[in-house]
C-alpha cells in the first residue's frame, strides 16, 4: 500500500502492528489523532470495528476512510473521508480542532458502547418481557 509506505516515513507516525490489549490504553493516550485504517477487501466492512469504540472513549479526534457504500455512523464526532485527498484534509482538521464540545460527546458514545452498559440494557429488556 503506497499510503502505508508514506506513513512509515513520517517521524511522528509509528505503525507497530498488533499489541496486547492491556497495552492499548497507554498507546491511545499518546495519540493526537486516532486513524482508522481499513482494508477495502474485508467482507465485514459494514461492521463497526471495536477500535472505533475504543477511540471514541478517549475523546480524541478520529479519522476514517469510508467505503463508497458505507454509511457514516457517527458523522458528528468522526471525520469520515471518501478519498485519499479528503483523508489528508480531515487529518489536518482533526489536529486543529477545538476539543471542548466534541471530546465529551465522543466519550459519551464510547461509554454507551461499553459491554457492561450493553449487558445492563439487555437485562432491562429481558426483565421487561419477563424473561429475566
Q: Where in this protein do the model-derived segments appear?
A:
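Nucleotide-activated donor-binding/catalytic signature segment of Leloir-type glycosyltransferases, i.e.
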Residues: 3-28
Amino acid at each position: 500500500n503506497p499510503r502505508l509506505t508514506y506513513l512509515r516515513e513520517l517521524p511522528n507516525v509509528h505503525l507497530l502492528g498488533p499489541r496486547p490489549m492491556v497495552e492499548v490504553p497507554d498507546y491511545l493516550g499518546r495519540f493526537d489523532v486516532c486513524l482508522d485504517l481499513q482494508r477495502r477487501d474485508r467482507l465485514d466492512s459494514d461492521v463497526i470495528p471495536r477500535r472505533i469504540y475504543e477511540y471514541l472513549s478517549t475523546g480524541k479526534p478520529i479519522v476514517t476512510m469510508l467505503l463508497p457504500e458505507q454509511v457514516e455512523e457517527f458523522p458528528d464526532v468522526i471525520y469520515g473521508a471518501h478519498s485519499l485527498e479528503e483523508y489528508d484534509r480531515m487529518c489536518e482538521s482533526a489536529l486543529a480542532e477545538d476539543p471542548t464540545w466534541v471530546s465529551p460527546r465522543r466519550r459519551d458514545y464510547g461509554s454507551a458502547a461499553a459491554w457492561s452498559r450493553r449487558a445492563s440494557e439487555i437485562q432491562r429488556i429481558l426483565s421487561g418481557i419477563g424473561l429475566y
